């Protein structure tokens, strides 16, 4: 199945969701998504069927943002290579932002009455011309932070609306991606040399990462600039808190990869196993509890080096595994706020 064919199958849904039209989205999903498709959604949605996607996930978001838009920043389509999986599966990977005027509660997150954004990484597996599996993370903590409702530890990295690729070609990716894929796989292999070898130089970060790289992490971790920002605001605390990380192709862990031109993307449900020890992580005490992690990533290389890396981790599910109900804490923190929708005045009377 060619990237062009996958793109054509997906086009009606992408068009209907761009300026969200509920009827058009329903019609497109009826054609493209198998009713019994397995959809692995981030916490709190969990696993649902294809027939439930709109009612369970999209419709509540649309009610919260009546002028909802789904804006792809990166679009990749193709067949998985023989890297840690059998290869030959047909996937689409999308990175983008849902945006709209936040006028009604969403998952008990209080509305702001203003433009809001929520990053998504959505992966769709096709058999013939229908979606049979989806793996997706929505950056729900990003929406909580914009509402002033995030109930947990402050993030170390910077908060921002994640930008599109600097190169401007995220929706028109072409060419053979084998060199980019080989570089990313080698980079991840070298990352895993530490902390077994306690010298950080064994990761050879300068070999793989551009000196002006941007690491776009999820809300709760934040974004870092350059190798120093990557190390200080994400990787250092991450490895101190969970030094025993294990990646895909180990036991029940598995990733699926796409590569084209200067881009690589990966999805796995789950694709990491870790134990929270050492210093703890993100303000979480070191419980010694093993967790499974889902990390859905996109990389863009420039002159053979990683210039941009978009990462979403299902942090709400991480907290769930550690016994922290983020939504219960959110309700406690915000129960003095007036619930319900925000009626914006007519602009003629503003």
Task: Identify the function of each model-found stretch.
Residues 1-350:
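C-terminal and inter-domain tail/linker signature
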């Amino acid at each position: 199945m060619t990237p062009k064919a996958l793109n054509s199958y997906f086009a009606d849904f992408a068009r209907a969701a761009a300026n969200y039209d509920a009827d058009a989205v329903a019609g497109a999903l009826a054609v493209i998504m198998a009713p019994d498709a397995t959809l692995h959604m981030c916490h709190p949605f969990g696993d649902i069927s294809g027939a439930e996607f709109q009612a369970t996930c999209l419709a509540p978001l649309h009610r919260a943002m009546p002028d909802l838009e789904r804006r792809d920043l990166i679009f990749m389509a193709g067949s998985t290579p023989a890297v840690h999986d059998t290869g030959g599966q047909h996937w689409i990977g999308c990175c983008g932002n849902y945006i709209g005027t936040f006028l009604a509660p969403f998952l008990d997150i209080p509305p702001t009455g203003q433009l809001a954004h929520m990053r998504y990484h959505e992966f769709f597996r096709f058999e013939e011309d229908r979606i049979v599996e989806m793996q997706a993370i929505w950056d729900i903590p990003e929406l909580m932070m914009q509402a002033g409702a995030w109930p947990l530890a402050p993030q170390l990295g910077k908060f921002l609306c994640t930008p599109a690729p600097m190169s401007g070609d995220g929706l028109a990716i072409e060419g053979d991606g084998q060199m980019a894929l080989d570089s990313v796989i080698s980079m991840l292999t070298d990352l895993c040399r530490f902390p077994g070898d306690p010298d950080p130089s064994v990761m050879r970060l300068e070999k793989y990462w551009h000196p002006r790289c941007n690491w776009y992490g999820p809300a709760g971790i934040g974004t870092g600039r350059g190798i120093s920002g990557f190390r200080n605001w994400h990787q250092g605390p991450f490895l101190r808190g969970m030094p025993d990380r294990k990646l895909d192709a180990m036991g029940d862990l598995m990733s699926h990869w796409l590569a084209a031109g200067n881009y690589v993307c990966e999805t796995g449900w789950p694709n990491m196993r870790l134990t929270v020890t050492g210093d703890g992580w993100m303000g979480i005490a070191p419980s010694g509890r093993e967790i499974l992690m889902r990390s859905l990533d996109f990389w863009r290389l420039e002159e053979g080096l990683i210039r941009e890396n978009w990462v979403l981790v299902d942090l709400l599910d991480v907290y769930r595994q550690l016994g922290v109900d983020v939504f219960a804490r959110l309700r406690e923190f915000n129960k003095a706020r007036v619930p319900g929708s925000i009626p914006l005045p007519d602009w003629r009377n503003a």
